[in-house]
Amino acid sequence: MNPADNILWGNIIKVHGVKGEVLVQVFSDDLTDYETLESVFVEIKQKQIPFFLSTFNFATQKRCILSFEDVTTVEQAKPLVGADIYIPVSKMAEADESRLSYQAIIGFEVMDTIQGKLGVISNFFQKTGQDLLMMDYQDAEILIPVTEEIVHSVDVKTKQVITTLPEGLIEIYLNEDASEPDAD
């Protein structure tokens, strides 16, 4: 399986119980769509390693308890804490595509309807007044307001965020970097 065909689904928060189970924070609104998963990919040393599931139990609306076939002790589970979990894009619930968390689209490419390919989403900020996506573009960090007029859609299969950025938005950030005084 090509890692590019997978999407970030969750993160292992901690070991749960004494049989090597793990508590997972899932970046999805409806876990019932995923209770039939047979396997997931756990990122270990920047590689996505397949883990087959023994059990999938609901903990809360956005958390589940997983047990893996070859992980049966706390000692085996501890090194997995903090690891990201990926699933194949093909396993992503259709309903979830419209409710993706910002965390899940980090690494997606920004495709603007006017300017074409721009950069990659590197972070997000959820603010009271305005959610923002951060895009890396020409060694600058561009903040993109998340509004219906600017961010049109997210294509999970191509890992693209489709936008129409306001005229001059990118230039504000590029000029800001160019106008910073040199430190002597």
UniProtKB/Swiss-Prot annotation:
It is found in: Cytoplasm. GO terms for molecular function: ribosome binding. InterPro entries: PRC_barrel-like_sf, PRC_RimM, RimM, RimM_N, RimM_N_sf, Transl_B-barrel_sf. It comes from the Bacteria. GO terms for cellular component: cytoplasm; ribosome. The keyword Chaperone applies. Its main location: cytoplasm. GO terms for biological process: ribosomal small subunit biogenesis; rRNA processing. The PRC barrel domain binds ribosomal protein uS19. An accessory protein needed during the final step in the assembly of 30S ribosomal subunit, possibly for assembly of the head region. Essential for efficient processing of 16S rRNA. May be needed both before and after RbfA during the maturation of 16S rRNA. It has affinity for free ribosomal 30S subunits but not for 70S ribosomes. Belongs to the RimM family. Binds ribosomal protein uS19. This is Ribosome maturation factor RimM. It comes from Cytophaga hutchinsonii (strain ATCC 33406 / DSM 1761 / CIP 103989 / NBRC 15051 / NCIMB 9469 / D465).
